[in-house]
Swiss-Prot record:
Family note: Belongs to the CWC16 family.
Disordered: annotated span: 1-26, 256-385
Record-given protein name: Probable splicing factor YJU2B
Pfam families for this protein: Saf4_Yju2
Residues modified as Phosphoserine: S40, S306
An example Gene Ontology CC term for this record: post-mRNA release spliceosomal complex
Coiled coil: 182-215
Protein task: May be involved in mRNA splicing.
Compartment(s): Nucleus
Signal peptide start and end residues: none
One of the GO BP terms on file: response to virus
Length: 385
């Protein structure tokens, strides 16, 4: 492309190299085009880069280091034989113009107008940096022997202070000097780590296939290993320890039972029996009779009453005496009828035994609340009968 650019220039028919010399003179233009529009005033348009952070005086905005501007470059003086240049540029955030110039004596840039520097400088002596030797000091070192001796002593003391730091830097550089050995060590460590990761992945895959798991497994940690070691599925005591404990317990056990044991067991048994007897006992006289609850026994269905029983019942009824009888006559009458009453009682017992249904007794008749008594609830109205 370079040679093609030089060969592909258009030369008009009236171009005369002896008269015009170059195409720029033929077109009456400068090679830098618009950048050289103020070249007659000694000003050249260049691309200037901000050397440090500043604050614009017009808009009070921060302009960072490295921001580029189209600046007017102009020579304003010399430092010995080094020229001093000034740069004038417009702020990209406002209409303010900023002027800066070089400082060859301090190897720095100085703000002339339009901005203020963000102070981030430090002293080179405090930072233990190498300072540039001034021209007057160089001449004095060359001509004055005493000054050169004093300067040498100061340099040696500075070297003693900086020697540990320099040796540490040198050791660090020597450690990383052999690139091949470092690369081999790094690759070997990488291969070992990769192999361990592959083995761990194979174990995880085998466990997932065995337990039919579809979730990713988290890598183990030291806390997990300690917890798993505490949760093993075996007892704390071995078989021999258990047998030894059993033998010791048997040896120290008393041969005779304690006095409180049988009494307590018998008392418990008696309390249980008492509760059962209470549950089987019939209710007391305060409880209502079956007739009061509307429960009657149906005698006609269970067994027909014999005529002998009816006759005995009629005989057992006490005859009413005439109204003129006395108590003495009643006693005489009772003594005479004593054998008759005994006969009537026996006949009543026989009748009751005949009238009772199968599986029932006389106690069931006297206590109808027992489960053996066959009771039927009669809900019919007494008046209707």
């Amino acid at each position: 492309m370079g040679e093609r650019k030089g060969q592909n220039k258009y030369y008009p028919p009236d171009f005369n190299p002896e008269k015009h010399g170059s195409l720029n003179r033929y077109h009456n233009s400068h090679p830098l085009r618009e950048r050289a529009r103020k070249l007659s005033q000694g000003i050249l348009i260049i691309r200037f880069e901000m050397p440090y952070n500043i604050w614009c005086d017009g808009c009070k905005n921060h302009i960072g280091m490295g921001v580029r501007y189209n600046a007017e470059k102009k020579k304003v003086g010399n430092y010995y034989t080094t020229p001093i240049y000034r740069f004038r540029m417009k702020c990209h955030l406002c209409v303010n113009y900023i002027e800066m110039q070089t400082d060859p004596a301090n190897c720095d840039y100085v703000i002339v107008s339009g901005a203020s520097r963000k102070e981030e400088r430090w002293d080179m002596e405090d930072n233990e940096q190498v300072l540039t030797t001034e021209h007057e000091k160089k001449e004095k070192l060359e001509t004055d022997a005493m000054f050169r001796l004093e300067h040498g002593e100061a340099d040696r003391s500075t070297l003693k202070k900086a020697l540990p730091t320099l040796s540490h830097i040198q050791e660090a550089q020597n450690a990383w000097k052999d690139d091949f050995a470092l690369n081999s060590m790094l690759r070997r460590h990488f291969r070992e780590k990769k192999k361990a990761m592959q083995e761990e992945e194979e174990k995880d895959q085998a466990l997932q296939a065995k337990a039919n798991l579809a979730i990713p497994l988290v890598p183990e940690s030291e806390d997990d290993r300690r917890l798993a070691a505490l949760l093993r599925l075996h007892t704390l005591d071995s078989y021999e320890d258990k047998q030894r404990m059993k033998r010791t317990e048997i040896i120290h056990r008393s041969w005779f039972p304690s006095a409180q044991g049988p009494s307590t067991s018998s008392s418990k048994a008696s309390t249980v029996l008492k509760k059962l007897c209470r549950g089987r006992r019939p209710p007391t006289g305060s409880a209502g009779a079956p007739g009061d609850l509307g429960i009657v026994r149906r005698k006609s269905r269970e067994a027909p009453e014999s005529p002998q029983c009816t006759a005995d019942n009629s005989l057992s009824e006490e005859p009413r005496g005439p109204p003129g009888t006395t108590p003495d006559s009643k006693t005489l009458q009772g003594t005479a009828e004593a054998p008759r009453t005994s006969k009537t009682l026996e006949s009543k017992r026989n009748c009751s035994d005949q009238a009772l249904p199968l599986g029932s007794s006389q106690e069931d008749l006297l206590h109808p609340n027992t489960p053996n008594a066959s009771l039927v609830a009669d809900y019919s109205d007494s008046e209707s009968e």
